[in-house]
Amino acid sequence: MGEETLRIAGRRSKLAVIQSESVKEIVQREFPNYTCTVLAKQTLGDQVQSKPLYAFGGKALWTKELEDLLYEEDLDQRIDMIVHSLKDMPTQLPEGFELGAITKRVDPSDCLVMAAGSPYKTLGDLPNGSVVGTSSIRRSAQLRRRYPHLVFASVRGNIQTRLKKLDDPENECKCIILATAGLVRLGLESRITQRFDSTIMLHAVGQGALGIETRTGDERLQAILAKVADRNSTICCLAERSLMRTLEGGCSVPIGVYSTFDEETSMLTLDGLVVSVDGADAAEATVSYKIKSDKEDAIACGQLLAAKLLEAGAKKILDAIHLPEA
């Protein structure tokens, strides 16, 4: 078989490039006849750093500029796939685009990062009125519920920028909350002060996994993506995305999840939480679901949990959230 070229694109941040390169390595290992190139492109979410994430409404914030390249008329500029942090991918993709594969998940938890030299080890240790930096209302809403003595402020920028801001003596934040996976992929695991297990915080839908977006029905890529995809992570993440899609929440709505799939018993367990922005109200539920058909049953599991959460009061919470227009 002759040599073929595959064009992989992602965002321009250091973390995004590492993620794109990781997919390139898998493809070239499994398909030595392919030469892969990586394109790094800026998106709207990268360009506008002055607004908190919820102010954008959460739709296509990190994706549109890249999606345009999948159908670029100039074939020399056209790409074949986009590597996203799955948590940043809208659960409803535009017509002509599909989620082609989900990679093996890195630790999906959120974590606490204290400023350099801080004597504090947990959020409970912090004095009253301490400022915690996070750009996610899912994180701040859950933490407000557990730690009412703390104050929360929006912190934007890539991970290195956020860490630099945190360590600046003039900075008001005592700590920041980040996705564990990002620090692990960047080799910055030593900055993690505490990983939050599911008793402290439920993570974002799809967190820790990479989602690969392609043109709908691109048969050439299907055999390639089958080697990139991870079954366990795919089942869990499809269920999580189904939950969010059913609740009609963008990535800025405070929905937390935790999922596990037991490959021996084929049982998928999915926990979900919808919490009000101020942390005062919450709806929680759990479902266990026997997986016989991976995609269909994972989606059904998410829909079932959504129905349980709505019964538990999630609709009232979601209806009360009026996010600013972009």
Swiss-Prot record:
GO terms for cellular component: cytoplasm
Cofactor note: Binds 1 dipyrromethane group covalently.
Family annotation (Gene3D superfamilies): Periplasmic binding protein-like II (3.40.190.10), Porphobilinogen deaminase, C-terminal domain (3.30.160.40)
BP GO annotations: heme biosynthetic process; protoporphyrinogen IX biosynthetic process
Modified residues (S-(dipyrrolylmethanemethyl)cysteine): C251
Cited PROSITE patterns: PORPHOBILINOGEN_DEAM (PS00533)
Listed EC numbers: 2.5.1.61
Cofactor: dipyrromethane
Gene Ontology molecular function, alphabetical: hydroxymethylbilane synthase activity
Pathway listed: Porphyrin-containing compound metabolism; protoporphyrin-IX biosynthesis; coproporphyrinogen-III from 5-aminolevulinate: step 2/4
Keywords assigned by UniProt, alphabetized: Heme biosynthesis, Porphyrin biosynthesis, Transferase
SUPFAM superfamilies xrefs: Periplasmic binding protein-like II, Porphobilinogen deaminase (hydroxymethylbilane synthase), C-terminal domain
Protein's UniProt keywords contain Nucleus: no
Cited InterPro entries: HemC, Porphobilin_deaminase_cofac_BS, Porphobilin_deaminase_N, Porphobilinogen_deaminase_C, Porphobilinogen_deaminase_C_sf
Reactions that this protein is recorded to catalyse: 4 porphobilinogen + H2O = hydroxymethylbilane + 4 NH4(+)
A Pfam family annotated for this UniProt entry: Porphobil_deamC
NCBIfam families tied to this protein: hemC
Family: Belongs to the HMBS family.
Function: Tetrapolymerization of the monopyrrole PBG into the hydroxymethylbilane pre-uroporphyrinogen in several discrete steps.
Miscellaneous field: The porphobilinogen subunits are added to the dipyrromethan group.
Protein name: Porphobilinogen deaminase
Organism: Eremothecium gossypii (strain ATCC 10895 / CBS 109.51 / FGSC 9923 / NRRL Y-1056) (Yeast)
Source lineage: Eukaryota, Fungi, Dikarya, Ascomycota, Saccharomycotina
Protein encoded by which gene: HEM3
